Design a protein with these regions (language model features):
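Active-site neighborhoods and metal-handling regions in enzymes and metal-associated proteins
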Residues: 1-257
Length: 257
């Protein structure tokens, strides 16, 4: 595990603020008719204007600034010309590289149109997305000094599965810092005793992720782009993520929207 100094955490907080502002801007542009690639282009423009670099473009072989999870895409969706329509959901996952450090965050939203009446499906999607947001918030709350990764994992799993959804097992949160992916892994589920999971120590920076499906937990690689992962049963998938630091005063969200 790569423990950060207070100065390094301050740098990550600066980068995280840039990332949160960019993602907030992107989410404000999400509406029917907007294409995934348009959002990707805007993301790169905004990040560079703020003096940072697109973190995901530093990943070997990946050529975009964001990953998009539209409908049944779970993670790592490559932006395309697909134009969003009412009833879709889209997760935007974005990373920023700033002064030598990465931050990472994601949010999933529904494409709505106030001219249309809400339906039972709308209500189901709203419940699904609210569950993911709550699981992330509650998972972060237990990311305290002296607790373990397993406390985060159990909290996320209990909330997601308690609502009738499934946590994806093959994709997890992670440490983040000078590298986009560092130790430890931070699963959204518990597959061992909490006492056997890594201890949360002061200065640890992690990306807490809630990766879950409305249907079953199984996923498959999709298309031929080598990146996009979808739910195997084509059910909707949600993604919520924040980068946080473990401090003596509690969890510090570095990518606060």
């Amino acid at each position: 595990m790569h423990v950060k100094t207070s100065n390094e955490i301050s740098i990550m907080l600066e980068g995280g603020k840039i990332l949160a502002e960019v993602l907030s801007n992107l989410l404000s542009k999400v509406r029917p008719g907007v294409s995934e690639l348009e959002l990707d282009t805007l993301a790169e423009k905004l990040i560079k204007e703020k003096g940072a670099e697109p973190g995901f473009k530093r990943v070997k072989g990946y050529k975009h600034t964001i990953c998009v999870s539209t409908n049944d895409v779970v993670v790592h969706g490559v932006p395309t010309e697909y134009r969003l329509k009412v009833g879709d959901i889209i997760g935007i996952d974005c990373g920023v590289y700033y002064k030598g450090f990465n931050t990472d965050m994601a949010e999933t939203v529904k494409i709505s149109n106030i001219k249309y009446q809400t339906s039972k499906r709308d209500d189901e999607i709203d419940k699904f997305l609210k569950t993911g947001k709550r699981a992330l918030e509650e998972g972060i709350k237990v990311a305290r000094l002296g607790n373990r990764v397993g406390h985060i994992s159990k909290k996320i799993q209990d909330i997601v599965e308690g609502a009738g959804y499934s946590v994806v097992r093959s994709l997890v949160g992670h440490g983040v810092g000078k590298s986009l992916h560092e130790e430890p892994e931070v699963p959204g589920y518990l597959n061992e005793r909490i006492e056997q999971t890594p201890l949360l120590v002061e200065g640890l920076t992690i990306a807490v992720e809630v990766i879950y499906n409305m249907g079953k937990k199984d996923v498959i690689y999709a298309n031929n782009d080598g990146w996009s992962i979808k739910s195997k049963d084509s059910s909707l998938s949600g993604l919520f993520e924040r980068t946080i630091a473990i401090t003596k005063d509690g969890p510090l969200v570095l990518t606060q929207v």
